[in-house]
A protein has these predicted regions:
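Short, solvent-exposed loop/turn and secondary-structure capping segments
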Residues: 67-70, 104-108, 170-174, 233, ...
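Extended, alpha-helix-rich binding/interface surfaces that flank or overlap catalytic cores
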Residues: 371-440
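Extracellular glycoside hydrolase catalytic/binding regions
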Residues: 74, 192-220, 224-395, 416
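Extracytoplasmic/secreted cell-surface and envelope-processing proteins
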Residues: 102-105, 168-171, 230-233, 274-275, ...
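N-terminal carbohydrate-binding accessory modules
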Residues: 2-94, 105-120
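Short, solvent-exposed loop/turn segments at secondary-structure junctions
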Residues: 59-64, 98-100, 166, 228-229, ...
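Structural recognition of the beta-strand scaffold that forms the well-ordered cores
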Residues: 53-59, 91-97, 101, 158-165, ...
Length: 440
């Protein structure tokens, strides 16, 4: 690495940590300090300027259709799910939301929307009295989020909220965008008739920001999950309705007016084929994990500096379907692709990148090699190949494993059953490598 870059990355002298700030999680990981976070160069830092690592895991369920419950609470309490996250060594949970679901009561009685064990989750009841059919009424999704954040704060776990889709379609939004109504769309979400304009999505973000304003348990807002540049004709700059850089600046700065403490997390649009020249992104590079090729020269600019974190999602072939596009998932080609499409931001001390989703079944040699390559890259072991490196009190790249609990589909989840413990040995061995271990 160039000596000037090493000098830039070394930053100020290491700051001595107060032992009271070092609150252990499980498996040798540590919780984050109690306050908000900021950025310095490509490091995420606490409110005293000390580097930290966001070691997070996703908790699904509320990315489903309106009324869908957080996963697992048919078997255990939501508090037990949060306890299990800390027990696994993580310090943050990433929770999805959809526009159509914020004000919808949790259903609680559906295989599709999730069941709720009322005995174990009494805080989620809207009324202690059942309806005439014997079923209980539950709180809205937004109220459930309040309960979750309250308990997360009690145990020292941080929360990042993620705008997943407008209406709760499975996976990423099918039109590739963060809105499904108005200019830039065909007035559908790719499946159903559109219901949410870009301005309406912004207003929902502001509702969430107002709900948790002043509460440093909530440390970040992931503005939109997996924007797809191929489907959505997304640009980086240019000012049109599908300009994702403009959206991040507009939404992010508006959120900062309400809640100046949080990190604003901006995902690069997925481009499985090189985007057109007019996109503002590098027209020679495919970026299935998220295209941040333009972020270095044309960065997102917020009202409050040092609060911007970029994000991408890294998955192997079994999930990301990269082979048919000729995109390598391991080896030199994998490292070169990460360097060019997002890793340079960290290597050159431009901005932090948080891998907002990552995961694999680890049941095949290919997925195990993918995990080894990715974790080695995150931990600075590919410096000779042009990847980021870390020294002194710097922390490696932050990430979020997908997902807590068991699942029937790849990547199958970190656990074999709900509750504290029950970890899959192959997955927990990988996630142990992404935990926060501060310099003492």
């Amino acid at each position: 690495m160039d000596a000037a870059i090493v000098s830039q990355l070394s930053g100020p002298p290491a700051l001595v940590r107060d032992a009271a700030d070092l609150r252990p999680a499980g498996r040798g990981g540590y919780l984050l300090p109690r306050g908000y976070l900021s950025t310095r160069g490509s490091q995420i830092v606490d409110d005293r300027g000390r580097p930290v690592r966001i070691a997070s895991i996703g908790w699904n369920g509320t990315d489903g259709p309106p009324g869908a419950a957080p996963s697992g609470i048919w078997t255990v309490s939501y508090k037990t799910v949060l306890d299990s996250i800390v027990d696994a060594g993580f310090n943050t949970v990433r929770i999805p939301w959809i526009d159509l679901g914020l004000d919808t009561p949790l259903h609680g009685y559906s295989d599709r929307l999730g069941w709720i064990n009322t005995t174990l989750n009494p805080e989620l009841l809207a009324s202690d009295t059942p309806r005439t059919d014997g079923r209980y009424r539950y709180v809205t999704t937004l109220t459930a989020f309040r309960r979750i954040v309250d308990y997360a704060g009690e145990i020292g776990l941080k929360v990042i909220f993620d705008h997943h889709t407008n209406q709760g379609t499975a996976g990423q939004q099918r039109n590739g965008l963060w809105f499904d109504l108005g200019p830039g769309t065909d007035n559908t979400d790719g499946i159903a008739p559109g219901r949410f304009s870009a301005e309406m999505v912004k207003e929902n973000w502001l509702r969430i920001a107002k709900t948790f304003a002043g509460n440093p348990t909530v440390i970040g807002y992931d503005l939109h999950n997996e924007p797809n540049g191929d489907r959505g004709h997304i640009t980086w700059g240019g000012g049109g309705p599908t300009d994702i850089k403009a959206m991040c600046e507009d939404y992010g700065s508006a959120i900062q007016d309400v809640e100046p403490g949080v990190l604003i997390i901006c995902e690069g649009p997925e481009t499985y084929k090189p985007p057109p020249q007019s996109s503002g992104m590098d027209p020679t590079l495919a970026a299935p994990a998220g295209n941040l090729t333009a972020a270095g020269a044309n960065p997102v600019r917020l009202k409050i500096a040092n609060k911007l974190v970029y994000s991408i999602h890294e998955y192997p072939e079994e999930i990301a379907d990269t082979k048919r596009w000729g995109i390598p998932e391991t080896g030199k080609g994998f490292v070169d692709r990460m360097n060019a499409t997002w890793g340079y931001l960290v290597r050159d001390n431009i901005a932090p990148v948080w891998i907002g989703e990552m995961g694999a079944s680890l049941r095949t040699p290919e997925t195990r090699e993918w995990a080894r390559n990715l974790l080695d890259y995150m931990n600075g072991k590919y410096g000779a190949e042009g990847g980021p490196t870390f020294s002194g009190d710097q922390q490696p790249i932050s990430g979020s494993w997908w997902l807590i609990g068991p699942s029937n589909d790849p990547p199958y989840g970190l656990q074999t059953q709900w509750g504290v413990g029950h970890f899959r040995p192959d997955q927990i061995a990988v996630t142990d490598q992404m935990l926060f271990r501060p310099q003492k």
